Amino acid sequence: MIQVLRNAQVYAPQSLGVKDVFIAGSKIIGVVDAGCEFELPDGVEVVEHDVLGRRLIPGLVDCHAHITGGGGEDGASTKVAAPLAETYFAAGVTSVVGLLGTDDITRSTEELLAGVRALREEGLSAWCWTGGYHYPLTTLTGSPREDIVHIDAVIGVGELAISDHRSSQLTLDEVLRTASDCHVGGLIARKAGVLHLHLGDGKRGLDLIRQALEQSELPARVFHPTHVNRQRALFDEALELTKLGCHIDVTAFPIEDGDGAISAADALREYLASDLPGNLISVSSDGGGCLPVFDEQGRMVKYDVGTSASLLEALNDLTGSGVALDCALPAFTSNPAEHLRLDGKGRIAVGYDADLVVLDDDGSVASVFTAAETHYKNKN
């Protein structure tokens, strides 16, 4: 069967104009001007969907999501339930990378891998980081390098915590050893081999990453700090790291007055207005994770829960303020897909996976296609 999305305003993520997109199996086989001829085999069933001029974008790539649920920082009653697959589809997310956070004790790598399989069975593309906040790392094989090499779904280590009172207070040697395992494991397995680092509010900021780059031969792409928009000073440090070749990740968490954080939309808006490399920034959701507030003694006083819907909210914030969709979109699609070597993801082009999202005029998700199946349709 061939499926055709007719009359779509395609952002691939670059703007291509109004196109017809042809899909066979799980792959895009043609992107042509609307109404133009496209040769198809005789006798093949063709199913057409008229998009009616709406915007068609690649499925969003969320590289930081608690697919088995996060939380637990104030006892077991504060553990967050695992988000359903429908949650991701409704947010326009078709590719997700799961992880463990603070609680890498009662939650396990085994559970995380089962979560990846469950999402794949529901039609999502899913991977995971091995490890969690703490060192020594929680792994399946006993070695992060072996997890990366031997387990298909594992693309690197994360979210290993630094500059945070909940971290293992890592030394430089421990960071270097872990980053080396990521790098070499990635080389052997042809994977990203990335060390995905949780950044807290600690005054040391990104100092461990700077030291690691200064005192080792490891390439900058191995170090992937996230939550870098949680403080102004931290974001300034992160901008400097991109000049060395590091890829940085901002989080689309809610912002409260006086907490010092920068919204994902504001952070990306600032980044895009600079002369920094456009491919070295991504936006993730922390979906399913606990977003806690602690007192001065490190006790949690309240928390919120992250959601993948925050990605589309940030994207709409950007476009609503005048940022062109094709400028904003790479940070949500092609940038994370290419940095993490998620082949076939993040673009609308021949040979890529047919992970496609149709947007309504108001920026909400109208429908989602993955592997030629419709996984979500807005009921409104």
Residue ranges with predicted function:
Residues 88, 116-119, 238-241, 271, ...:
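Generic structural signal for hydrophobic
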Residues 180-292, 300-302:
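Active-site core of metal-dependent hydrolases
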Residues 43, 51-114:
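Metal-associated gating/positioning segment near the N- to mid-region
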Residues 2-3, 10-57:
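Histidine-rich, glycine-flanked metal-binding segment
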Residues 273-358:
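His/Asp/Glu-enriched, well-ordered alpha-helical/loop segment
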Residues 8, 25-28, 345-380:
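C-terminal cap of metal-dependent C-N hydrolases
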Residues 8, 26, 53, 64, ...:
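Divalent metal-coordination and catalytic microenvironments
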Residues 83-136, 152-165, 187-201, 221-226:
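Divalent metal-dependent hydrolysis catalytic cores, especially in the metallo-beta-lactamase
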